[in-house]
Amino acid sequence: MATPTIKLNSGFDMPLVGFGLWKVNNDTCADQVYEAIKAGYRLFDGACDYGNEVEAGQGVARAIKEGIVKREELFIVSKLWNSFHDGDKVEPICRKQLADWGVDYFDLYIVHFPVALKYVDPAVRYPPGWSAKGDGSIEFSNASIQETWTAMETLVDKKLARSIGVSNFSAQLLMDLLRYARVRPATLQIEHHPYLTQPRLVEYAQKEGIAVTAYSSFGPLSFLELQVPNATNISPLFEHDVVKSVADKHGKTPAQVLLRWSTQRGIAVIPKSNNPTRLSQNLEVTGWDLEQSEIDAISALDIGLRFNDPIGYGMYVPIF
C-alpha cells in the first residue's frame, strides 16, 4: 500500500511518513536507506549537519540502479545549515549537498534553524557544526532571515529545489516571513511529541497552508545517548501507561500509536529504525484510527518539554 501524502502549497505531494537520517551512522547509512526503500519508504529527511548525505545518496543510487524505485518516486529532503545563511552562500552549499546525494534537485530544502552563524568554508570543515572555530564558541553572521529566504527562493527559480520550508521556527517568525515571502514556505518541521505538542504553532501553520512535519516523535528516546538531561529524567513515552494502554487496545506498538497520534491530525512524521519489522510497522498509518478521547489523552501529556535545544548541547544560542 502506498504511503498517504500531503498536498503542499507548492503543488507537490509529500509522503506522510518518511525516514529520518539524524544520527544514522555513516557505516550503515547506505544500507539503511536502501532497505528502507525496499520496505516502501519514499521520503528521506537529511541535512548537512547529519554528515551522512553522501552515504544516503549511495543507498538511493543502489535502489534506482536495481530498478526498485525511480528518482521521481522519491521525496528527498535536505536542510540549509546555520553557517550558510549569507545570501551568496545558499546556492553553493545547496549544490554541494545535491552532489553529495547524487541528485539534480531536492524535493524539499529547509532552513534548519532560524539563526545565522559565521560562515565556515566546507573545505575547512564539513559539516561545520555550531562553532565556527570548532571550540564551542558561537559567532553569528549578520544575515537576516529575509536575506536567507530570498536566496532560498532563487533555488526554486533555478529548479534546484521544488519546495522550500523552515524548521524550528516560532509562530512569530512565520508571521514575519509570510509578510515578505515571494515563495511561501511549504513546510514547517518542529519537535513534536506528547511531551511537547505546541498546539498553537501547529494550528497557525496549518491555517496558513503550511504542512507540519514532526521530528522526535518518540520524545526522549533519540536524546538518551546524547545524555541530554531532560531526556534522562522523564519517563520514556513507550513505557507511559497512557500510550501503552492505547497500544494494547488497538493491538499496535507504542511507536505506532505515537506516529498515528500525529498523522491522524495531518502531521507528517520521519521516524527511523534499522529493524526490518519496525521499519514496516512505522509505515502503517492508515486502516486504523485512534478515538478522539485517545488523541486527547495523549495530547494531555504535554508539559512543554523540549529536548532539541542548542543550549542542551552546550551551545549558547537561545532560540527557544
Curated annotation (Swiss-Prot):
Protein's recorded name: Probable NAD(P)H-dependent D-xylose reductase xyl1
Transmembrane segments: none
Family, similarity comment: Belongs to the aldo/keto reductase family.
Site (Lowers pKa of active site Tyr): 79
Annotated function: Catalyzes the initial reaction in the xylose utilization pathway by reducing D-xylose into xylitol. Xylose is a major component of hemicelluloses such as xylan. Most fungi utilize D-xylose via three enzymatic reactions, xylose reductase (XR), xylitol dehydrogenase (XDH), and xylulokinase, to form xylulose 5-phosphate, which enters pentose phosphate pathway.
CDD domains: AKR_AKR2D1
Active site annotation, chain numbering: 50
Binding site for substrate: 112
Pfam families: Aldo_ket_red
Originating species: Aspergillus terreus (strain NIH 2624 / FGSC A1156)
